[in-house]
Amino acid sequence: MQKILQTDDITDNQVLRKRKRKRTETANSENANSALEKAQRDPYSGNAFLPGESSSDEETPLMELSKEELCNKIESLKEKLRSIRKENSRLRQSLVMLQVLPQAVTQFEELVGMAETLLKSGGAVSTPASTLWRATNNSSPDSFASLCSNSNSTSSSPSSVKAEEEQHPGEKQFTIERWQIARCNKSKPQKFINDLMQVLYTNEYMATHSLTGAKSSTSRDKVVKPAMNQNEVQEIIGVTKQVFPSADDVSIRRMIGQKLNNCTKKPNASKAPNSQDGILK
């Protein structure tokens, strides 16, 4: 009787093991089929990008793995995590480059415009005074050095001085370059004119000149200031109306005068570190 009971227990244990093994195999098979179907539906999602990914890792439950196998699996997951972080860092750098690229293109266009301006002014016989005033406040110091060297080389002899005096009435047409407009604040007309005149002239020039040359009734200065070149004033008005079509000539001239008055009230502003007025003296 005891042998029969022992035989029944052994048989029951074998049946239980077979059932457990069958359930495990069925579950693993279902998981493998599910993963295969998911990969077929969306081959580019999830872990499809991870290198060395194999479905064999999921075939064995973690509970049945040895300590060494678990350690190897953890190391493998850490390596994959490091790879993902490196890829994320590379993608962030690419995104930053794409964000900075438009600004770099704009700055490159400005440099091209400055180079074209220097090439045009380099072929002139003499450098007009108004051009020197504008060059002292440009962003590139090389432009001022180039203009000064050109002026010194052409005005070293009396004949060149006479040629400059003869050429002054027929001075080259005043033009505002695109890179100069790009540097200006375009939120309001007054801010645009302030920035544009700051690019074109130095503070000392604006402090010693007026819009029309007539003495203002509200001005405290006893000395009448010389008028700005009216061709330059019209050019500034034209450019401002291109940026702000609703602005009219009267309001633009008033804004130009306001900028000149502000520079008059701040005579020491021309002694800023970025000013090169001492060179002109």
From Swiss-Prot:
Residues 171-271 form the BEN domain. GO terms for biological process: negative regulation of Notch signaling pathway; nervous system development; positive regulation of neuron differentiation. Its main location: nucleus. One of its GO terms (molecular function) is chromatin binding. Residues 15-62, 143-172 are annotated as: Disordered. Residues 19-99 form a coiled coil. Keywords: Coiled coil, Neurogenesis, Nucleus, Repressor, Transcription, Transcription regulation. One of its GO terms (cellular component) is nucleus. Residues 143-160 have a biased composition (Low complexity). Residues 162-172 have a biased composition (Basic and acidic residues). The keyword Repressor applies. It comes from the Eukaryota. The keyword Cell inner membrane does not apply. It is found in: Nucleus. SMART domains: BEN (SM01025). Acts as a corepressor of recombining binding protein suppressor hairless (RBPJ) and inhibits Notch signaling in neural stem cells, thereby opposing their self-renewal and promoting neurogenesis. Interacts (via BEN domain) with RBPJ. This is BEN domain-containing protein 6. It comes from Mus musculus.
